[in-house]
A protein has these predicted regions:
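Conserved class I S-adenosyl-L-methionine
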Residues: 516-565
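Rossmann-like AdoMet/SAM-dependent catalytic core
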Residues: 552, 558-657
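Conserved alpha-helical positions within TPR/SEL1-like repeat arrays
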Residues: 15, 42-53, 76-87, 110-117, ...
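Residue-level recognition of tetratricopeptide repeat
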Residues: 40, 74, 108, 141-142, ...
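N-terminal accessory segments
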Residues: 130, 137, 141-371, 415, ...
Length: 657
């Protein structure tokens, strides 16, 4: 029987040429092979792929159609044709070809994912989710599917049923893939967990304290998604906060036998990790405080017949206190510590040593800077566990072509190995993301807080990031670096300075001509409910104690005012340092569009576009209508008045010098 396609080795050689972008060679060799293999549908499909990679889409379509003439049941060519039509903007033909590919191969993961992407781009999220579900059922480890899945989760996806299949997919996403900050999918995860009938029942109980604690803990110990998620991320949901707080109280008062504890310890230790991550933000009753003191005395005096009970009591304490530097640990055999306590103790010691290695640019003399520094030394911001890395670093050119900004002047050759400054890096989450976003980049990250920098440095070691140089410095002293940068990112920073203009002037001075700067500034309209709370309801405004922070959280939780109640929906409400940063910051400015225009004009920066407005948000505000110039900052004032929540996080945008 005649072979219509070349041998496997020959085909692999052609694929290798394509992967190495040797397009001319690939075309020449394929056309030569077609002299012998005239009816090779594979070779015609391959030629289409090569031309598509060269952006010659018309030729690509011609060769794909020739392949179909030779074999109209070859699913790959329909998928490739669909991709080409989607690049040309012909969504109708793209969909029909993906659907044809699926009809020929019902297990075609890539075609399902490509179809899901089209629905996602059209903001038809329910259909996108259906296609993606099918793709993930076939291959739950397919990266493209996981990226789209996390994008859908970031939209606060509402699950309509208790589909436990997604438990394993989300666990896979947050444990094996570093492509999403878990905090961004927290609401979607909470929504899915609420569909579990047993958890839903617990959430709706009038008084959980009347239930059998051990039975409740066994129910929670069986939910692997709940356990895995609360180990790595604060669960930003008020219903779950109330539930977990009540269960914590049950745990500290329950007299566990060793075997009983072992049955439910996975959940209890996970709850300890949750409390550590949210910085023990839950209220503590007087009776709980008394019980904590009782357990501490018991440990100090070593009143135990069985060593296992020491470990149980230590775990109970870790639900209420950060034990990483506790004197109690010196009283106990280290073999008794659970893995979580061992981990936070090691992390504390590592950060202590890292502080000695972080260079200091200068002594901070500015009074406001010192107040801000004190806040972040007390409450390093934010505490996080998992980063969101870019899968494949991009050149500066490709990055700015990918995001929706308009750059008036840019010589990309000057940015081949970009020098990047993160001005106000905090605990490093943003810095790590940036360091993996830009190809061949060198990142300098500065912050006032040494505790925050040590946290950031530890995270770099954990995730093997080696292109970031951390320095302790006041932004006002950055000229002492004697260095200029191609890109500066300063998100959520200069609005915490006494005069934001002074800070921006410094940043512009050390930015190269034609360089780019990303700024993030609070919106007075977007944060109107926070400002209203401060003005009308906040108690003891200059008292930054844990007790007062919790007292004011309770005012918000118990408020009958619907505007004030919306503050609970902020992620920042659900951890102590973030709540302090949001409500009790020692220095804060809130902006509006006219004030930003004035600020940028003063330093000669050109507005290039917002970086934190997804198509989902733009659709809500009907921004994509014809005639609206989104690159004119003055146009956004009216938009924000009509849609006051559009910048509820902050204004985040790129400018050019």
């Amino acid at each position: 029987m005649e072979n219509i396609n070349p041998s496997k080795d020959v085909l692999l050689h052609l694929v290798n040429l394509l992967q190495n972008k040797k397009y001319n060679e690939a075309i020449a060799q394929t056309k030569k092979l077609l002299i012998t293999f005239k009816r090779s549908f594979y070779l015609y499909n391959f030629l289409g792929l090569v031309y598509a990679n060269r952006s010659n889409f018309e030729k690509a379509i011609t060769y794909y159609k020739k392949s179909i003439e030779l074999n109209n049941v070859y699913p790959d060519v329909y998928n490739n044709l669909g991709l080409t039509y989607s690049l040309l903007g012909n969504i109708k033909l793209a969909k029909s070809n993906f659907e044809k590919a699926i009809s020929l191969n019902i297990n075609f993961t890539l075609a399902y994912t490509n179809l899901a992407k089209l629905f996602y781009l059209e903001m038809d999220y329910s259909r996108s989710f259906i296609c993606l579900h099918k793709s993930l059922l076939i291959n739950p480890n397919y990266l493209e599917s996981m990226i789209l899945f996390k994008n859908l989760l970031c939209l606060d996806l509402i699950f309509h049923k208790n589909d436990t299949f997604f438990y394993s997919v989300i666990i896979n996403l947050i444990t094996k893939f570093n492509i999403v900050q878990p905090r961004k999918i927290s609401l979607s995860v909470a929504n899915l967990l609420k569909k579990d009938p047993s958890i839903n029942k617990l959430l709706n109980l009038n008084d959980i304290n009347k239930t059998d604690p051990l039975r409740t803990l066994k129910i929670l110990n069986q939910n692997i998604l709940l356990i895995e998620f609360i180990k790595i991320c604060p669960l930003s949901d008020n219903d779950f906060e109330n539930l977990l707080k009540s269960i914590r109280k049950q745990i500290i008062f329950f007299n566990f036998g060793v075997s009983e504890y072992n049955e439910v310890k996975n959940f209890i230790i996970a709850l300890s990790e949750q409390c550590f991550l949210n910085e023990y933000v839950y209220d503590v009753s007087l009776e709980e405080k008394n019980k904590i003191s009782e357990i501490e005395k018991k440990i100090i005096n070593n009143i135990y017949k069985d060593k296992a009970n020491i470990g149980i009591d230590l775990t109970k304490l870790s639900l209420y206190k950060n034990l990483s530097n506790s004197i109690l640990l010196s009283k106990i055999d280290k073999n008794i510590f659970n893995d979580f306590i061992k981990k936070i103790q090691l992390e504390f010691l590592l950060e202590k040593n890292l502080k000695k290695e972080i260079p200091k640019l200068s002594i901070t003399k500015n009074p406001t800077s010192n107040l801000v520094k004190k806040q972040y030394e007390e409450n390093p911001y934010p505490r996080w566990s998992k980063p969101a890395f870019t899968i494949e670093p991009l050149s500066v050119e490709n990055f700015f072509r990918k995001i929706d900004v308009k750059l008036p002047k840019l010589n990309y050759k000057l940015f081949e190995s970009p020098e990047i400054l993160i001005a106000g890096c905090g605990t490093g989450q943003h810095s790590l993301n940036t360091s993996t976003t830009f190809k061949d980049s060198n990142v300098t990250a500065i912050d006032l807080s040494l505790n925050s920098l040590a946290y950031a440095k530890r995270k770099c070691l954990e995730f093997k990031i080696n292109n970031i140089n951390f320095i302790q410095s006041d932004l006002l002293n950055l000229e002492l670096l004697n260095k200029k940068f191609d890109i500066i990112e300063s998100v959520g920073v200069i609005h915490h300075m006494k005069d934001p203009l002074d800070g921006l002037k410094i940043l512009v001075k050390i930015l190269n001509d034609g360089g780019l700067i990303e700024l993030g500034l609070y919106s007075e309209l977007g944060r109107r409910n926070i400002l209203k709370f401060r003005k009308d309801h906040m108690q003891n405004k200059k008292n930054y104690s844990i007790e007062n922070l919790k007292f004011n959280r309770k005012i918000i939780k118990d408020s009958d005012n619907s505007d004030i109640k919306t503050i609970i929906k902020y992620n920042d409400f659900h951890t102590l340092s973030e709540f302090r940063d949001m409500i009790f910051h020692v220095q804060e400015h809130n902006f509006n569009i006219p004030r930003i225009i004035e600020l940028l004009d003063h330093v000669g920066l050109t507005f290039c576009g917002f970086s934190n407005l997804s198509k989902h948000i733009l659709k809500k505000a009907d921004i994509n209508s014809d005639g609206f110039n989104k690159f004119s900052l003055s146009n956004w004032g009216k938009i924000e008045k009509d849609y006051p929540d559009i910048f509820s996080g902050m204004y985040q945008f790129w400018c050019q010098k």
